[in-house]
UniProtKB/Swiss-Prot annotation:
Disease: Brugada syndrome 7: A tachyarrhythmia characterized by right bundle branch block and ST segment elevation on an electrocardiogram (ECG). It can cause the ventricles to beat so fast that the blood is prevented from circulating efficiently in the body. When this situation occurs, the individual will faint and may die in a few minutes if the heart is not reset.
Chief location category: membrane
Molecular-function GO term, any one: voltage-gated sodium channel activity involved in cardiac muscle cell action potential
Residues exposed to the Extracellular side: 23-156
Family statement: Belongs to the sodium channel auxiliary subunit SCN3B (TC 8.A.17) family.
Encoding gene per record: SCN3B
Source species: Homo sapiens
Domain Ig-like C2-type span(s) in chain numbering: 32-154
Name listed for the protein in its UniProt record: Sodium channel regulatory subunit beta-3
Subcellular location, record wording: Cell membrane
Effect of residue 161 to T: In ATFB16; results in a decrease in peak sodium current density
Length: 215
């Protein structure tokens, strides 16, 4: 099990790297919505662009709304990332990509008071020869912060399936070993019976059974 846990992430990283190199694509993956107190939490916000839309002016705004409160700005990217004055000041870290398709941020040292609704607004003005269209996308992330990490149902199911697979493989190997052992034993018994039958034949019969050689 530990070996599988070490090899599986490595194989996944190799596969992701190979796909990203051979087939450069953008996938809008939703953000996680649960965090543990004291740990960093990445708020994922991905807004993909088409290949012909690379030239664009992008502005990113992150808002936070506490439970029962109103939205207020906590982070802004406009010609460079900058943190605005807010209760999150000093705990926000830019985690986006150079092409600004991934505009995620990370909240450091998450507290229970960080629970609430996070809004990621991405505004783009594309630079075409004939026109300059403006597009705005919004991602909502309802975050819940807990004191301790809860049991992940997916990981529990995966672990159970892994144990079932190990038991199945063990039984299959045991059956194969028994089958091979019986097969070898039968072959040895047949060889011993043939040898015993040959030794039981009188010497006269052995000489008579020989094929005469013509001169």
């Amino acid at each position: 099990m530990p070996a599988f846990n070490r090899l599986f992430p490595l194989a996944s990283l190799v596969l992701i790297y190979w796909v990203s190199v051979c087939f450069p694509v953008c996938v809008e993956v939703p953000s996680e919505t649960e965090a543990v107190q004291g740990n960093p939490m990445k708020l994922r916000c991905i807004s993909c662009m088409k290949r012909e839309e690379v030239e664009a002016t992008t502005v990113v705004e992150w808002f936070y709304r506490p439970e029962g409160g109103k939205d207020f700005l906590i982070y802004e990217y406009r010609n460079g990332h900058q943190e605005v004055e807010s209760p999150f000041q000093g705990r926000l870290q830019w985690n986006g990509s150079k092409d600004l398709q991934d505009v995620s941020i990370t909240v450091l040292n998450v507290t229970l008071n960080d629970s609430g609704l996070y809004t990621c607004n991405v505004s783009r003005e594309f630079e075409f020869e004939a026109h300059r269209p403006f597009v705005k996308t919004t991602r909502l992330i309802p975050l819940r912060v807990t004191e301790e990490a809860g049991e992940d149902f997916t990981s529990v199911v995966s672990e159970i399936m892994m144990y079932i697979l190990l038991v199945f493989l063990t039984l299959w190997l045991l059956i194969e070993m028994i089958y091979c052992y019986r097969k070898v034993s039968k072959a040895e018994e047949a060889a011993q019976e043939n040898a015993s039958d040959y030794l039981a034949i009188p010497s006269e019969n052995k000489e008579n059974s020989a094929v005469p050689v013509e001169e």
